[in-house]
From Swiss-Prot:
GO CC terms, sorted: virus tail, baseplate
Compartmental location: Virion
One of the GO biological process terms: viral tail assembly
Keywords assigned by UniProt, alphabetized: Late protein, Viral baseplate protein, Viral genome ejection through host cell envelope, Viral penetration into host cytoplasm, Viral release from host cell, Viral tail assembly, Viral tail protein, Virion, Virus entry into host cell
InterPro entries xref list: Gp5_OB_N (IPR009590), Gp5_Vgr_C (IPR054030)
Protein name: Protein Gp5
Disulfide bonds: none
Quaternary structure (record): Homotrimer. Interacts with gp27 trimer.
Biological function: Tail-associated protein of the baseplate hub that is essential for viral DNA ejection. Involved in the tail assembly.
Gene behind this protein: 5
Superkingdom in the source lineage: Viruses
Length: 421
């Protein structure tokens, strides 16, 4: 059969079924003007179930092979479509496209040329074009008044009812304000979420919106060019005219990379986490900071190192502890100080040594004690002085069962009272 030689007919009609195609080819049942009555009873008309299955035509940029390309599903019950018959018996129909309009009445499912489910057209979109509101941008939601818009239409002052798309107001209302940055107090620096720069002009904003409310925009409006992907829950990604990107995720976010990931930021990086943050690296971590590192921990710091800790500080180390310091070392402690050590203790010093104590002083050793000085030796005590030995006191008393004092040089004992033995 050569199509057209035995007759060629166009048709226009309304989709009444798109969900029951057993072959799932995107076929639709269409009630056609002039061919089918608007009555749907078996006695006087044609029921929706008895209408032809109409094949959808797809564009040449769609493969329509093995699932490659866009699926031919997009029309809804109540959509006006047009096409042609491929046979003179009017049994093989093809749908070429859809016909938008301005719906005026709610659907009546009992009458043909209507959505049998009585859903489309929606009640809140009557008396306005089928063109998406984001593409039209008739009115700013901040100044929109439904009654005024309806009155203007009723009085013939407007060609249709102007209504804004609800996501503009919802996105503006949900913008995050005064997000705190890291600082030492609540009055530290803050920043705001960058608001949507939506300023579309008809006919430059190319919009695709699904039935549930998912949206994709390619806005070519001069000076307001955007890319926008929006999920019905409020999750979105929007690229602004200046190339900035805003991503907001209403639910959880998972990013899984099976190989490497590289992030290069030429400016600053700010991260604010309202809840907890967990970082787990199963191998090594290398950090290089060319400037300063500041940390402010309002709670506790708990570190557990299973191996060694090595710190190299090229300059000074300053620590200020306002309360107590407790250290427990299970093995040895070795300290090497190449210059001086200065300790100032305002209270007492208590040392308990389970083994021996040995001090080696190359230079002088001086002790200044303003109070009493008591030495208790459980065993023997030996003093060896290579040069002079001088003791000066108001009273000196050496008492013991046996005392030995060996002097290599001179010795001087001076006091008001000196008692030996």
């Amino acid at each position: 059969m050569f199509m057209g030689l035995d007759g060629f007919e166009w048709w226009t009609g309304v989709v009444e079924d798109r969900t029951t195609d057993p072959l799932k080819l995107g076929r639709i049942k269409v009630r056609m003007i002039g061919l089918h009555p608007d009555k749907k009873s078996s006695e006087q008309g044609i029921r929706t179930e008895e209408l032809l299955w109409v094949h959808p035509m797809q564009s040449l940029d769609n493969a329509a092979m093995n699932g490659i390309g866009n699926a031919p599903i997009g029309v809804v019950e109540g959509t006006w479509v047009f096409g042609f018959f491929r046979d003179k018996l009017r049994q093989d129909a093809v749908a070429m496209g859809v016909l938008p309009g301005i719906p005026e009445d709610l659907p009546n499912g009992s009458v043909g040329f209507n959505d049998p489910n009585e859903k489309y057209p929606l009640a809140d979109k009557l008396n306005e074009p089928d063109t998406n509101r984001l593409a039209r941008n008739d009115v700013d939601p901040d100044v929109y008044d439904e009654s005024q818009s309806q009155t203007a239409f009723d009085n013939g002052e407007a060609p249709y009812v102007y209504r804004p798309h609800p996501i503009i107001a919802s996105k503006r209302a949900a913008e995050e304000k005064e997000i705190p940055l890291a600082g030492y107090n609540a009055e530290g620096p803050k920043y705001d979420e960058k608001g949507t720069p939506y300023a579309a002009q008809y006919p430059y904003n190319h919009v695709r919106e699904s039935e549930s409310g998912h949206i994709h925009e390619i806005d070519d409006t001069e000076g307001a060019e955007r890319l926008h992907t929006y999920h019905r829950t409020g999750t979105f990604e929007e690229i602004h005219p200046d190339g900035s990107r805003v991503t907001k995720i209403i639910g959880d976010d998972f990013e899984i990379v099976h190989k490497n990931q590289n992030v290069y930021i030429k400016g600053n990086l700010n991260i604010t986490v309202v809840g907890d943050a967990t970082f787990y690296c199963q191998q090594n971590v290398t950090q290089q900071i060319d400037g300063d590192l500041k940390q402010h921990v309002k709670g506790n710091v708990d570190q557990h190192v299973e191996m060694n800790v090595t710190q190299t500080v090229d300059k000074d180390v300053t620590q200020v502890v306002h309360q107590n310091v407790t250290q427990t070392v299970d093995m040895n402690v070795t300290q090497t100080v190449h210059q001086n050590v200065t300790q100032t203790v305002d209270g007492d010093v208590n040392q308990t040594v389970g083994g021996n104590v040995q001090s080696n002083v190359t230079g002088d050793y001086t002790q200044n004690i303003s109070g009493n000085y008591t030495i208790t030796v459980g065993g023997s005590m030996s003093e060896s002085v290579s040069s002079s030995y001088t003791r000066s006191a108001a009273s000196i008393s050496d008492d013991g069962g046996g005392a030995t004092l060996n002097l290599a040089g001179s010795a001087a004992l001076d006091g008001t009272t000196v008692s030996l033995g």
